[in-house]
């Protein structure tokens, strides 16, 4: 038998899986919310604190003012936004211009903004350059936006700004877009703007 300890600062988490369906109103936030009670019930020690330091020599992790010894340590820090890559963007601005890469509050902001797009309005999605987490993500989200508009705001559209010439699963996405959203026609609900000239270098949340 082994003794397993998970050190995690958050009491619960929201899955990125199915978050698109929350954004389009097909799911509730609670359906993608999970805690750690199931792990606790299986004998796993869950410490609700942030890891502050790892001492590889002493084989300890400091969290919440305590040291936790280990034989093996697996570090899973997740991802963080690199806000300073785009002039004018920050964690504060993300409250107005959501990136949506982390499920939770960002999901709710994006859901509310999608529902608030005016009739005939435009939603802009910026696909980051490679490498980044979940390469199909921006195009999945564009598909979900277009599906929402088709049923709730049929004159609205989605524009994808993408500095890449090619993207993950491109053939499958364009095939679906052509079939369901008129991609490539004058009435397309999705417009792609590929190439280095569409790389986003600055945003103005107040413009």
Regions found by a protein language model. Name each.
Residues 1-45, 129-172:
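Beta1-alpha1 glycine-rich phosphate/pyrophosphate-binding loop at the start
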Residues 7, 12-27, 105-112, 118-123, ...:
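Conserved N-terminal glycine/acidic-rich loop preference
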Residues 31-36, 75, 100-104, 151-154, ...:
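Short, surface-exposed, polar/charged, turn-prone segments marking secondary-structure boundaries
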Residues 37-41, 115, 178:
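Alpha-helix boundary recognition
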Residues 42-53, 58-61, 68, 146-207:
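A Rossmann-like FAD-binding core segment of flavoenzymes
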Residues 46-140, 144-151:
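FAD-binding core/adjacent interface of flavoenzyme oxidoreductases
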């Amino acid at each position: 038998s082994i003794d397993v300890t998970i050190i995690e600062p958050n009491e619960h988490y929201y899955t990125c899986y199915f978050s698109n369906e929350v954004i389009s109103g097909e799911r509730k936030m609670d359906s993608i919310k999970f805690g750690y009670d199931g792990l606790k019930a299986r004998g796993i020690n869950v410490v609700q604190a942030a890891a502050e330091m790892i001492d590889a020599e002493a084989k300890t992790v400091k969290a919440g003012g305590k040291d936790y010894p280990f034989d093996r340590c697996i570090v899973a820090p997740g991802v963080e936004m690199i806000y300073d890559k785009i002039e004018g963007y920050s964690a504060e601005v993300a409250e107005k211009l959501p990136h949506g890469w982390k499920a939770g509050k960002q999901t709710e902001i994006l859901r509310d903004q999608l529902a608030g797009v005016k009739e005939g309005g435009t939603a802009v999605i910026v696909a980051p350059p490679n490498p980044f987490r979940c390469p199909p993500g921006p195009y999945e989200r564009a598909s979900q936006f277009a599906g929402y508009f088709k049923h709730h705001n049929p004159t609205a559209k989605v524009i994808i700004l993408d500095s890449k010439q090619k993207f993950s699963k491109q053939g499958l996405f364009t095939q679906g877009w052509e079939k369901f959203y008129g991609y490539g026609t004058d009435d397309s609900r999705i417009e792609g703007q590929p190439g280095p000239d569409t790389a986003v270098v600055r945003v103005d949340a107040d413009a």
